[in-house]
Design a protein with these regions (language model features):
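Well-ordered alpha-helical segments embedded in enzymatic catalytic cores
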Residues: 2-3, 146, 190, 194
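Short flexible coil/turn linkers enriched for glycine and charged/polar residues
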Residues: 11-12, 22-26, 141, 156-158
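Alpha-helix capping and helix-loop boundary segments enriched in small/acidic/polar residues
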Residues: 14-20, 49-57, 171, 175, ...
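Short beta-strand scaffold segments in enzyme catalytic cores
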Residues: 28-32
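Phosphate-binding glycine-rich/basic clefts of nucleotide- and phosphate-handling proteins
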Residues: 33-168
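Adenine-nucleotide phosphate-binding core of ATP-dependent small-molecule kinases
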Residues: 132-140, 169-195
């Protein structure tokens, strides 16, 4: 509701207003009566006509962008030397920074052994070595932050290069607005369902 109070100050008559507040981890939607007659009331319960919310927010968009656009540089979608697909779960857990069990699993000693075995089996071991570096240096949040910075930059540009030099010198990934839209389509649909 606080997200709509600035807007309410601009109203000269009562209106029914949909306030959508997309936070880091949640999206909240409220339908409110707003206007001069409501502005100074401490108790706004009577002006609240409806509310809904979901546990999807901006962080989920960043995580999906990191997973879909950055993780292929770390081996996601790759194969073993025998042509068997590499498991996707370690890649998801690496970027699922809003999921404590997933992060605990990614940073477990058992997963460290899995990653070392994947390097031995992978058709492109240099990519999986990057994932091992994420594991060893606990770089999950930096990866998701790089995705967030890319998302922000793409609001004003049609394509950007996401620098990942903290993983490997000169490592970067080109991301377009279309790729961003594709990557975040699933969590964005959940947000739109609230509206």
């Amino acid at each position: 509701m606080a997200a709509g109070l600035d807007f309410e100050a601009t109203l000269s008559e009562e209106q029914t207003v949909l306030v959508v507040d997309i936070g880091g981890g949640t999206t909240d939607c409220s339908v409110l009566l707003m206007g001069p007659q409501w502005r100074d009331r401490a108790d706004r319960q009577q002006s609240l006509l409806g509310h809904s919310g979901c546990r999807v927010g901006g962080n989920d968009l960043d995580i999906m962008l990191a997973f879909k656009q950055l993780m292929p540089l770390f081996g996601l979608g790759g194969e073993t030397a025998k042509g068997i697909a590499l498991p996707a779960l370690p890649y998801w857990n690496a970027v699922a920074t809003n999921d404590v069990p997933a992060q605990n699993d990614f940073y477990s000693a058992a997963n460290g052994r899995v990653l070392r075995d994947l390097i031995l089996d992978a058709a492109e071991p240099e990519k999986v070595k990057r994932l091992l570096k994420v594991y060893q240096q606990r770089l999950s949040y930096r990866l998701v932050r790089a995705a967030e910075e890319s998302k922000i930059a793409l609001s004003g540009q049609t394509a950007i290069s996401a620098p990942l030099g903290f993983v490997q010198a000169d490592l970067a990934e080109s991301i377009s607005q279309d790729q961003l839209a594709d990557a975040i389509s699933q969590p964005l649909m959940r947000i739109q369902e609230q509206v």
